Amino acid sequence: MANVLQYLIRSAERFPDKCAVTDDVRSYTYAEFCHLTRAIGSGLLPLTRPRQAVGVYLPKNAQAVAAFFGIQWAGCFYSVLNTELPGNRLRQIAQTLAPAVIVTCEALLPQAKEIFPICPLVCLETLAGQAVDAEALASVQARAIDTDPLYVNFTSGSTGVPKGVLVSHRSVINFTEWWCETFEFDENEVFANQTPFYFDASVKDIYATLRCGATMHIVPRKFFSLPKKLVHFLNEKRITCIDWVPSALCMIVNFRALDKEKPESLKKVMFLGEVMPTKQ
């Protein structure tokens, strides 16, 4: 397997009409999601060269996930630019990243222009409307190798300057294969994504979903302040697996959200990123 795009291609062939990724506004089947990513990739081809960085300055939603894969179709690697960071910190990151282009959206375009005055910008809405150039995409993918970079995440910059950590396709493939085999994920899995996309932990949700032909629901952030509604969301979406920070799990217990409603489909509960309090 040369890159993680093979996960998407394979699942789109197996489950074209199945829900792939959803947020609180939109939902994409595998066929729709694959087409969208190919359109984004086609739109990026004239703006980039293979193995260049592309910044992603978007809200946390299903379209952002599509942007990640569209960037891969263009042979590039992505870096999520946290929209809540101060402008100075984002400019530091952009200076280090040196992206060929930054993908944003019409709603954030004025803000992006102010923060990244010297970086080329393109709106996702523009890319999504492009015709798919199947021949050009195939040409780029024919030259792809598994050690190509997939994404770069930047540290918090506690030493004064954010540092980028570059991760290859092979690293994500190896981890995803182990993750899915160890915990026996399959196409019946329904993930509820909690972690932000600028954290490595989100990689598990995204790529396990695409690898298995499963479904990933991006949980609205507001629900993590409304534990009873969060539990209801888990039932409404028939979530089978969560991999959250302990503070999110503890909130459900501490506010006695389970007294009113219990998760009915949940089978796998995992935690990451924080120590689980002993009393829990």
Predicted segments, located by residue:
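Short, Asp-centered acidic motifs that coordinate Mg2+ and/or phosphate
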Residues: 100-101, 190, 240-241, 268
